[in-house]
Structure formats: structure tokens, C-alpha cells
């Protein structure tokens, strides 16, 4: 039973808008805006539009979140609110889990850190302390769990284009097997960056 949904998509930043645009045949494709793609053969992509992380997170939190994780947390907020779980005092948070999938994870974070390292090798290895926590593909699940204080099963799923489907199947099975009462599940990706487009 699906009780709540959230969405940040190339055709809308919530479920209602995404659905309306989908049934009306609106395309999410457009020129790439996340970086200068003028030297790439492909110069269009389906980006999430009109999203500004600063509208959803304070500065400290933004330092900890790759864009893909920002998308995941914002969509999870929508889903939790839609399900009526946000202020449910009867909810046993030890029996609420989170499984969020990503085909890649923090690609932009990886690009930034690898580039910074390459340019500063003479000064010795230096990385942002948030490099690994921002990049790993299961961190979105962790941030959602921390925000809502959910203490049930928590992990990420990585299986290329099937990642989100597998996350939903895993979440269903955890409920079916009695390991959780409620699961927040889905997927997020933010791979429209040079390595994602050119790789």
C-alpha cells in the first residue's frame, strides 16, 4: 500500500505537476545548464528545473549533501507529508526504514574533489572531509533517516537503471517479512555533469 509520494523530476518539482505534465506529453529535455556543454557532442539533457538547494537546506546542511541527496531528501519530505507521517506521534520510528537507490550517487562531488586534488598535488593530498560521506550512494537514505529519526532498516541500492525498482521491491519485502511497518523508498540521481554526459 503506497500512502504518500514525492517527486522532483525534469517535468515537475512535485507529484501533481509531474503527473499533469506527463499526461499532457510535456518533455523534460532541454539545453544543459549544470555546466558548459558546448564542447560535448550531446548538449541536451533532462534536468530538474528551478531547484535551488538553499530554498530547502541551511548552509551547513548543503555542505554535507551532493545534489542527488538533496533531491532525495526533498522528495522524501513530500512523501512523508503526503502520507501523513510527519507528525504521527503513534508511529514507531524503530519500525520505519529507508531505502533510497542511486545508479551512481554523488558524481558531482567526485568530480569536484578529483579535480581539486589534481590541481593541488604539489601541496600534498587534501580532500574535503565531506568527500566520501557526500559521494557514497547510500548517504541519501542516511540523511532521510536522520531528519525524520527513523531507526528501521536503512541502506542504498545500486543496480544501474533498475536501482529504484529494486529499492521498492526490497522495501515491500521488508514489510511483507515483518521487518518494518513503514518504508520510505525510491531513487534519486543527479548525473548531468561532464563525467556523466561524456562518460
What are these model-derived regions, one by one?
Residues 1-61:
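ACP-dependent fatty acid/polyketide chain-elongation machinery
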Residues 7, 65, 157:
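Generic anion/oxyanion-binding catalytic loop in active/binding sites
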Residues 13, 17, 23-32, 62, ...:
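Acyl-thioester C-C bond-transforming condensing/cleaving domain
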Residues 34-85, 137-151:
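A glycine- and small-residue-enriched flexible loop/hinge segment at structural boundaries
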Residues 5, 101-103:
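Structured loops at beta-to-helix junctions and adjacent beta-edge loops in soluble globular domains
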